[in-house]
Design a protein with these regions (language model features):
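Short capping segments at the starts of secondary-structure elements
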Residues: 17-23, 36
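Short acidic, hydrophobic short linear motifs in intrinsically disordered regions
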Residues: 21-31
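Short beta-strand "wing" residues that participate in macromolecule-binding interfaces
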Residues: 57
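Glycine-centered, phosphate/nucleic-acid-interacting loop/turn motifs that mediate DNA/RNA or nucleotide
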Residues: 53
Length: 125
């Protein structure tokens, strides 16, 4: 998975932060003012994100409203997964990552690992 470009990332941050589906005009208005971006530029990048599956859309009169199809966590997990493909020692890389986590993060990871292990042990219905 390739990381978002600068404008893709800025648009996704706006959409992820929006409490409800948002129009292209609303996205453009919430982007940082510098550099100034043309409406059509924002529209093109929003359409690219829609075609990539990151945004969903619904018609609202003459406009579309956009909402995230995938979460920030999905994006981060994809980047981490991609990073792990670049090493021959995935375990070592994961252990170094765990070494940077605080106690609450380690506890959450431990709970997720315990749940995943329990799911694998449970016979399928």
């Amino acid at each position: 998975m390739r990381p978002f470009g600068e404008l893709e990332a800025a648009i996704m941050e706006v959409v992820w932060s929006a409490p409800e589906p948002i129009t292209i005009r609303e996205i453009k208005d919430q982007l940082p003012q510098q550099p100034e971006r043309a409406y059509t530029t924002v529209q093109t990048v929003v359409d690219i994100l829609y075609r990539k599956g990151w945004l969903g859309r619904a018609r609202d009169g003459k406009a579309h409203r956009y909402a995230p199809s995938r979460s920030r966590d999905d994006y981060t997990a994809g980047l981490l997964g991609e990073a792990l493909t670049t090493t021959t020692d995935r375990t070592g890389a994961l252990l170094r990552l765990v070494g940077t986590m605080d106690a609450a993060e380690v506890a959450a990871l431990r709970a997720a690992l315990d749940a995943a292990t329990a799911d694998r042990r449970s016979p399928a219905p």
